[in-house]
Amino acid sequence: MADGDDRGGKRTPQKKNVVVESNGRAYVKATFNNVIVTLTDQYGNTISWASAGKMGFKGSRKNTPYAAQKAGESAANEAYELGLRRVDVYVKGPGSGREGAIRAMSESGLEVASIRDVTPLPHNGCRPPKRRRV
């Protein structure tokens, strides 16, 4: 191997210099098990994302409003540093962290222009899972 060849070593991920418009979209997917927050530009290109699992929560703690708040805060701070200022929020799913994620994004400095619920509703499609007996 040559002296300048550094294969096999750990690579440090480099931040891309992304030019971000001030307007964008925030997608909050709140399932029964996790919360995923994705911030994109107007064209759907991802600027930043975070989930309760990425924030270090495991198991049943991932679907708490506090975990959703931390995920929303992390994604919003990263996008704010890149220049995002105003978002339209699209919420999907029945999870408990919907409001917490939106509140955290607005407290992080992002202006929430609108909130839309895009939860898919079946027109009597698949049979739902059986009820839990605890």
From Swiss-Prot:
Annotated GO MF terms: rRNA binding; structural constituent of ribosome
Ribonucleoprotein found in the keyword field: yes
GO cellular component terms given for this protein: ribonucleoprotein complex; ribosome
Pfam families: Ribosomal_S11
Gene Ontology biological process: translation
Keywords noted in UniProt: Ribonucleoprotein, Ribosomal protein, RNA-binding, rRNA-binding
InterPro entries: Ribosomal_uS11, Ribosomal_uS11_bac-type, Ribosomal_uS11_CS, Ribosomal_uS11_sf
Source domain of life: Bacteria
Entry's family note: Belongs to the universal ribosomal protein uS11 family.
Quaternary context: Part of the 30S ribosomal subunit. Interacts with proteins S7 and S18. Binds to IF-3.
Role this protein plays: Located on the platform of the 30S subunit, it bridges several disparate RNA helices of the 16S rRNA. Forms part of the Shine-Dalgarno cleft in the 70S ribosome.
Protein name, entry field: Small ribosomal subunit protein uS11
Organism encoding this protein: Salinibacter ruber (strain DSM 13855 / M31)
